[in-house]
Amino acid sequence: MSESAPTPRRERVIVGMSGGVDSSVSALLLQQQGYQVEGLFMKNWDEDDGTEYCTAREDLADAQAVCDRIGIKLHTANFAAEYWDNVFEHFLAEYKAGRTPNPDILCNREIKFKAFLDYALMLGADLIATGHYVRRRDLDGRTELLKGLDPNKDQSYFLHAVGGEQIARSLFPVGELEKPEVRAIAEKHGLATAKKKDSTGICFIGERRFTDFLKQYLPAQPGDIETTEGKVIGRHSGLMYHTIGQRQGLGIGGLKEAGDDPWYVLGKDLQRNVLLVGQGNDHPLLFSRALLASRIYWVNPVELERPRRLRAKVRYRQSDQDCVLEKTADGYRAVFDEPQRAVTPGQSVVFYDGEVCLGGGVIETAEAWDFGGRP
């Protein structure tokens, strides 16, 4: 990185400062590139239940320390009402329906690249920036969303529902870097967040147990745990606490006739409030050949008059999977070349053409893989 004075630019950029190292380095890099840089810390959750779980205060202090260090102004904004209406209520509704949602995807679409973008433009910004590990490319009059260069940190999965017009107004400085480089830059420039641990999990839950958090908002409905043969072998405390492919926390044990293989969640019978389980990590009912997706968001319009061969992820960090995507009367159907394990309704499937993230949608149903005739 050159230490020479940057050429001043006229564009004013407001960086979403989370109090983490990625957004900190993003602000620094943009400043070095000559942009007029300011920061903005957004509060998306009201801490009515105390501060022991939520790190917002600490994060704000870290963001302020970084802004002071590099000499930029830090704005603050409260988007808690927008978050509740556009993200959290949907999150609760999905769990109530027995599905497993991903609120981070909706948060990016509705808060970071909508509420924050609108607020930044109101403040007079030309562009916003975030610390996401993605890239953008302007091509043929549209802006594409590309995977981040670091395959271990690529976050395009979480940004697939953000439109090209919003991507065009956004910069992603660390998307061109690998994580160790980002930390090295932060350390070299004495940023307070250089060694700060990456945040994990859902932001509004923090470090508390997920079941304890959910109980505050949704009443638990206990029911039976059944095998695929219909035998009741236990009780669950609520379908919403379980997800497809889950092994831990089922409380099944001591069944003499069952053998030693661990039990896994295979499905949920919502009408009967029954959790369906089976033994073995490779149980056939854990694998799907196809899925149906709805609520599709494309970064840019995608032509699907006929089936199209693409690659897809059905969860974050999964390697890209070959599939054929077609539009149907009920949504979009993706048929995979290889069996897909633990395809989970409520989670997102995201489609790629090479390094370009095209968009994705919410998984509605999965079709079981027919292992007949296969080795």
Swiss-Prot record:
Main location class: cytoplasm
A GO molecular function held by the record: tRNA binding
Annotated disulfide bonds: C107-C203
Domain of life, per lineage: Bacteria
HAMAP family: tRNA_thiouridyl_MnmA (MF_00144)
Keyword Chaperone belongs to the record: no
Enzyme Commission numbers on file: 2.8.1.13
Keywords: ATP-binding, Cytoplasm, Disulfide bond, Nucleotide-binding, RNA-binding, Transferase, tRNA processing, tRNA-binding
Family label: Belongs to the MnmA/TRMU family.
Gene: mnmA
Residues flagged as site, Interaction with tRNA: H132, Q347
Region listing for Interaction with target base in tRNA, in residue ranges: 102-104
Enzyme class: transferase
Record GO cellular component, one term: cytoplasm
Protein name: tRNA-specific 2-thiouridylase MnmA
